[in-house]
Amino acid sequence: MAYTQSKSQKVGYQAGVKDYRLTYYTPDYTPKDTDILAAFRVTPQPGVPFEEAAAAVAAESSTGTWTTVWTDLLTDLDRYKGRCYDIEPLPGEDNQFIAYIAYPLDLFEEGSVTNMLTSIVGNVFGFKALKALRLEDLRIPVAYLKTFQGPPHGIQVERDKLNKYGRPLLGCTIKPKLGLSAKNYGRAVYECLRGGLDFTKDDENINSQPFQRWRDRFLFVADAIHKAQAETGEIKGHYLNVTAPTCEEMLKRAEFAKDWNAIIMHDFLTAGFTANTTLSKGCRDNGMLLHIHRAMHAVMDRQKNHGIHFRVLAKCLRMSGGDHIHTGTVVGKLEGDKAVTLGFVDLLRENYIEQDRSRGIYFTQDWASMPGVMAVASGGIHVWHMPALVDIFGDDAVLQFGGGTLGHPWGNAPGATANRVALEACIQARNEGRDLMREGGDIIREAARWSPELAAACELWKEIKFEFEAQDTI
């Protein structure tokens, strides 16, 4: 049987173990526009040269293994291998560096975040020669992006569906997150929506437990939405969590909610990218918005030296599909440095983002007109945080006050009213040219003079702050 010889065949097969850097470290390589580029923070074991550690990452995340193999002669490694094309020392870190690796596009299945991540991060993180490894950023080429659907609808389509413009959207996670009956759950939804919120939502771990089966919850929530819409004249919504044990069950729950224009919610990391992409395509086909919760993200992204940065997970989610995703708050109870957070918020929402190392963005990213994803600020926020949230996140965001609504001393509806009044006051002040960060306290106090609900919330939470140093910084 005849076949064409590759460059490797012309040299001949040489069995044995050789340094990775002899094959996979190519500092003279110029990345192509079609390459997927990765920036890894590498901490090698003592005694392992930087070039060898970087080349090992390139090899083990593409075509390499620990020894030469005869079947290398049956392909063209120069065409398919990953290449470490640059090593960047980190100031103040003698044992760490950034390795830049280019992957040929042919290594990846079209439209598959699952396959892309399996290759790039699936095996190499357990490599013994590395003390720690973190994927800081990816550059996804336009040629690969065009094989993905992306978000089911995107920011502008959501605005048009809801007929709400010029301000962030206001939401609330129903608490307690577990234990309520379906009927009492629906009651809380109704009270929050009637009080002035745009949305309420399921929490990440409410699926279909013995105390509240999914079908019962969906039906009581539907009644609550319809009643609140009729009374307020506004379009209302609730994020129904359809995360399930199987993809078939997940799609069945989404199909059940389709007829009353529901908003679907999904835990994209615990359920997996295959399930998320499947659900995203179903939501686009059926005209349903898709809300994404990032449950489990901190297991991967919180440690500075090991794991996957959330900006990478955010890019992957935009490709896989979701109309909004939780991003942290900067000011609330959850981890989030301001510069870093705004960096990946822009990566979610904007069409073209320039490289900006001050915000942790290692590569310029062109999204090729893929719809944007709305950022969701949620976790330990209350009315005093409203000016900062509006200033930080702008209009294309969902601000979700769970305890900051349901913890109001007068009940759920007054809690919702307090948040709506605070939001409207901040938007008016911003539009009048006032400085929300400098004058935010005065703006809230002025609004509280004519809103007893807001005044009560201000008094309750005036001492509550979450002032801890962020662990993940530039």
From Swiss-Prot:
Active site (UniProt): K175, H293
Keyword Magnesium: yes
Modifications made to the protein after synthesis: The disulfide bond which can form in the large chain dimeric partners within the hexadecamer appears to be associated with oxidative stress and protein turnover.
HAMAP family the UniProt entry points to: RuBisCO_L_type1
GO molecular function: magnesium ion binding; monooxygenase activity; ribulose-bisphosphate carboxylase activity
Functional note: RuBisCO catalyzes two reactions: the carboxylation of D-ribulose 1,5-bisphosphate, the primary event in carbon dioxide fixation, as well as the oxidative fragmentation of the pentose substrate in the photorespiration process. Both reactions occur simultaneously and in competition at the same active site.
Domain of life: Bacteria
Entry EC number(s): 4.1.1.39
Site annotation Transition state stabilizer: residues: K333
Subunit structure: Heterohexadecamer of 8 large chains and 8 small chains; disulfide-linked. The disulfide link is formed within the large subunit homodimers.
Binding site for substrate: N123, T173, K177, R294, H326, S378
Compartments, record wording: Carboxysome
Names of required cofactors: Mg(2+)
Lineage: Bacteria, Bacillati, Cyanobacteriota, Cyanophyceae, Synechococcales
Binding site for Mg(2+): K201, D203, E204
NCBIfam families per record: PRK04208.1 (NF003252)
Record-level GO BP terms: photorespiration; reductive pentose-phosphate cycle
Note: The basic functional RuBisCO is composed of a large chain homodimer in a 'head-to-tail' conformation. In form I RuBisCO this homodimer is arranged in a barrel-like tetramer with the small subunits forming a tetrameric 'cap' on each end of the 'barrel'.
Residues with the N6-carboxylysine modification: K201
Name of the protein: Ribulose bisphosphate carboxylase large chain
Catalytic activity: 2 (2R)-3-phosphoglycerate + 2 H(+) = D-ribulose 1,5-bisphosphate + CO2 + H2O; D-ribulose 1,5-bisphosphate + O2 = 2-phosphoglycolate + (2R)-3-phosphoglycerate + 2 H(+)
Protein family: Belongs to the RuBisCO large chain family. Type I subfamily.
GO terms under cellular component: carboxysome
Cofactor details (free text): Binds 1 Mg(2+) ion per subunit.
InterPro entries attached to this UniProt entry: RuBisCO (IPR033966), RuBisCo_large_chain_AS (IPR020878), RuBisCO_lsu_C (IPR000685), RuBisCO_lsu_C_sf (IPR036376), RuBisCO_lsu_fd_N (IPR017443), RuBisCO_lsu_N_sf (IPR036422), RuBisCO_lsuI (IPR020888)
